């Protein structure tokens, strides 16, 4: 009996020592980082017996900033989509006016060789346009318009408005080949000596304002005999040039952040000495978990965009080049899905 017990114990020990050992779990590499930020801003002004005058106003604006970035060894692929839309209603005009409208898509692919420190060969694609028509609302030349029925008031305001923009009118799309330089975490400099793209103006009425070229079939025809509604102009323009883009992203602390993008473009094919400038700034100040102040500024200069002004309409009836500037200060609800790897 003792011998059998010893044999059984030996066999059990042998079984235990030869049993497979479980290998430790190795976490798979995660290369994607995603983030989503949504914001809704609301503004309201109400005046009662206000001696200085003014309008009762209501405004609302929505903003989405989505990012999907891939990073593996020496390769990266960054994608960003920004959507911005807002409207304003003022008691002096019985219509809703658009006060914010932007579509911006950017995708950048980069690769770094072993000998390059903080330098990447890159290909950068971007697209910019807007969702809906934008108008300049001029006061209708109708006496006592406020005494008319509301439907008639709205129609008079619509008849007096002037179209300024629309979907794909204009739109800018570019592919830039060059080098990315990232000296710090908060600064990226992209220089692309080969940048090709198109300026698209779908609406015929806006083509002259964006200096679109004459269609071939109208070349050689006297100007007085050509159409004047914009149908005589092309709906796109090809551009080839060099682009310099600077991106800054700074988180000062948990409650305050700043981002900026400057884009300079020189067109080799037409007056390369004239730079097209786009400069966007955004300041975010977090007041509470879901509420924040936001200040945005947008500066644009494009020598191909002709802007009319009542101050010098007699001297420049077709408009002239001007610096465009927009500033928005807003308070609203903000919800952010923190960047995460998946």
Set out the residue ranges of the language-model regions.
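Outer-membrane beta-barrel "beta-signal"
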Residues: 323-342
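Residues that define the transmembrane beta-barrel architecture of outer-membrane proteins
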Residues: 56-62, 99-105, 169-173, 236-242, ...
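Cleavable N-terminal export/targeting peptides
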Residues: 1-27, 338-342
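Outer-membrane pore/translocation modules
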Residues: 98-241, 318
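Residues on the lipid-exposed face of transmembrane beta-strands in outer-membrane beta-barrel proteins
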Residues: 36, 40-42, 62-70, 105-111, ...
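Surface-exposed strand-loop-strand hairpins of Gram-negative outer-membrane beta-barrel proteins
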Residues: 43-63, 91-95
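Repeated loop/turn-to-beta-strand initiation elements of outer-membrane beta-barrel proteins
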Residues: 74-77, 116-120, 186-189, 255-258, ...
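Transmembrane beta-strands of outer-membrane beta-barrel pores
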Residues: 40-46, 72-74, 83-89, 125-135, ...
